[in-house]
Structure formats: C-alpha cells, structure tokens
Amino acid sequence: MKLEELVRDIRAYRGVVRKGPITNVAAGLIPIQSEDVLAAYGEDAAVIKCGREILLMAADGILQDLVHRNPFWAGYCAVLVNVNDIAAMGGQSIAMVNVLSCSHEEVRARIVEGMRAACDKFGVPMVGGHLHPDTTYSAVDVAILGKTDRSRLVLSSGADVGEPIIFATDLDGQFTEGVPYSWDTTSKKSKEVVRRQLRTMNKIAPYLTAGKDISNPGALGTLGMLLEASGKGCVVDVSKIPRPKGVDLLQWLTAYQGCGFVVTCREARTKLVIDEFARSDITAEVCGTVTKGSVFELELDGDKRVLFDFSKDTLGCAPPQKL
C-alpha cells in the first residue's frame, strides 16, 4: 500500500474522525475548579488526589452498530476498554458502574453476559449502575474507578523531544467475527495471562514519560492523541510497527487492540521497557521519535508524508488540563 493512500484512509477513518468533536465539548467544561484534580481532559482517565493515593476515573461508551451486531461482545468490550484506560495510566482497576439502555430483554441479557464475562476475566467487579428498560435504542456505557501513586502515574501529555516511541502489542489474537477492526487477544486466554499483561504498564510506569492504550482510532490515531496532548510532533517508520503475519496493513493500523499500548520513555530506558513487555508476551519495538513542533510524519518505503498537523488538526486531546 502506498503511503499517500495510507495517510488518506487513516485521516478518513471513523475512529479518528469522531474524536474531533471532543474539543468543543471539553472546552465547555474547562476550567475545573478543584485543587484535587491533577489532570483531566486529554488523558485516558482523570487524575484525582486522594490522600497519599491517586484515583483514576474514566468512562467509555460502545458504538451503537457493535451493540446491534454483537451485543455480547459490546458488553465485553465496555469493560475491556475501561480496564485498558486505567492500565495505560499505570493504574490498577478497582470497580465499575454501567448505564444500560435497552428495551429488548434478549439483547439486554447478552450485553450483561458480556460484561460479566469480562469482569470475571479481568478481576474487576461491576458494582452498580442505571438501567433504561424502555428506550428506542440499545446502548451500554461503563465508568471505572482505579488507583495508582505519583511514582507510577503515566500521563498522555508527558512526551518530550528526542524520546523514542514504542508500540507494544499482543500479536497472539484474531479479529472478532463480523467486527473487522476488533483485534481480540483476551477472550480465549486465561485470566492469569490477561491480568499479567495489564499489570505490565504498572510495572514499567516509573520509566515512562507518556503512554496510551491503542483504542478506537487505531495505533497511529492513538499516538496522535498522545502527541496532541503533549504538544509535540513525531516521525514514525510504519514498517517497524509490530504486526501479525498476513494481516492487512490498513486494517491493522486502524484496529482496536485487545492489549496494545504506545509509550515514550528516556532513551536509556528503552531496552528495559521493551524487555518488560516481552516478559508478558507483548511484542514491543521502537518505531519513531518525538519531535519539536506540531507535525506527525510517517515514513514508508522511502516516502514521507504528514499524517496530522496539530496546528490545524485535532483529535480532541489539546490542551489537557493539568493543574
């Protein structure tokens, strides 16, 4: 695939495009008047001071077409995306609540089954929520509470010029049937394996300067969010991004990863970070460098193109509120 086509298709990808409106919504809610809020918009979770601990709060909703297509997987993913958000911040998940909107009893039951399966898999309880049993639509949304400490807090907004960019992904998975952009690495693995993988970010957190889990915008879109939050640019060699054999490049770069992270660190910490990911069967490689400015550049087969220019483009992560 030519780089020009790749840039065009990623910029037009739904998971990327739908991030833009976040900026206007967040602008209406900033500034936050609380001395206990340490970081908010632009991060995977809000960061709240609570005594000696740091609390993490996040929420995610599931795309309506996924709820219609596969309600069990929608419920499962509603939990998965939240525990990944907490892990990406260097945190440990505590508990979740949900808002379930569905008038069809069978669909509702499948969504709940999916949530329960994921709660059991990741070891995070669902402790309450709210039900709309009479809506004209079906939707599931989950909010999560996590915790960490200051030495292990990983922000999206900490990347600095010259630092290596590391993509880390569990390549042992499969695309969910009927959901071509959902790379499932957790449903068929034991709870011991997936929980060990989630703990990896907490282990390496003191060595990272920034991090995000690879989510709906895909690998490059997620990195774009991190860079926008950090106020930086980058150069990335697409050919170095870990990818399973036989998987289409565009499909892979726009996939939601069951277990995938993009992180930055000091150059001296690179081997330590990559080796720690490897201990949890997560393949990690240096694929680029953080640069000064606002331009996100890609390289492939001798060609070089601009994917995003954050002086003009937004993925809903600028500026994050850090107090």
Residue ranges and their predicted role:
Residues 1-3, 14, 30, 280-323:
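Acidic, Ser/Thr/Pro-rich beta/coil linker or hinge segments at domain junctions
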Residues 1-67, 89, 98, 116-127, ...:
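Extreme N-terminal cap/leader segments of soluble proteins
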Residues 191-258:
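Active-site-proximal betaalpha loop/short-helix elements
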Residues 37-40, 132, 232-243, 274-301:
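Beta-strand->loop->alpha-helix junctions that form or flank phosphate-binding loops
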Residues 177-193:
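Short, compositionally biased
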Residues 264-271:
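Helix N-cap motif at beta-to-alpha junctions
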Residues 70-97, 113-121, 196-206, 219-225:
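Small-aliphatic-rich amphipathic alpha-helix that forms the alpha element of a beta-alpha
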Residues 54-57, 62-64, 92-177, 289-291, ...:
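Glycine-rich anion-binding loops of enzyme active sites
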